Amino acid sequence: MVVIIPLALQSIVLVRGLNADHGIFYALICVFAAWVPDAGAFFAGKLFGKHKLCPIISPKKTVEGLIGGIISNVIVMQLLGWVFSEIVYDGTRQASVLSLLVIGLFGALVSTLGDLSFSLIKRSCKIKDFGNVIPGHGGVLDRFDSVIFTAPFVYLVASLLPIVP
């Protein structure tokens, strides 16, 4: 973990370097693609959650929450593309709908995989949180577990399908 975490987070720096003019936008996508599905899954799970996703690893996660996380991520990725295109660049630059769709759909799954992976590590170590730096949220690693998986994924997608062609 000592090597994997910094290498994975380095993807945020690498994704920023893919496009000199829009690197900050790319880096923000890394974070949003990880945190939006988490929030969407939380609210969808609270409202509609009936079927447990991985009860042994993370008992509160539901299939309905995962679906809500995917839907919310797709919507927010497209909204970010629209904000970038229409508000930041006044319609002169267009974000790739396809690239953001792929990041929205599969980024939510990768984000959930990251969250579940770190939950499994915590369960095997018999700890609830990786720290108590952020009240109610545990440690910094608890907030960035999904980013650690999502950032390399966004880098891969943005390398193959540029977010801003």
Q: Predicted regions span which residues?
A:
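Juxtamembrane boundary at the C-terminal end of a transmembrane helix
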Residues: W82, L156-P165
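Hydrophobic residues in alpha-helical membrane-spanning segments
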Residues: L7, G136, A151-F153, I163
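Membrane-embedded alpha-helical bundles of polytopic integral membrane proteins
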Residues: M1-L105
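Short, conserved aromatic-histidine micro-motifs
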Residues: Y89-A95, H137-G139, F144, I163-V164
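Hydrophobic transmembrane alpha-helices of multi-pass small-molecule transporters
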Residues: N73-V74, R143, T150, S159
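Short leucine-rich amphipathic alpha-helices used at interfaces
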Residues: N19, L101-V102, S117, R123, ...
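Acidic (Asp/Glu-rich) catalytic motifs at the cytosolic membrane interface
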Residues: A34-K50, C54-P55, V63-E64, L109-F149
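Single-residue recognition of alpha-helix boundary sites
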Residues: G49, V76, K126, F153-L156
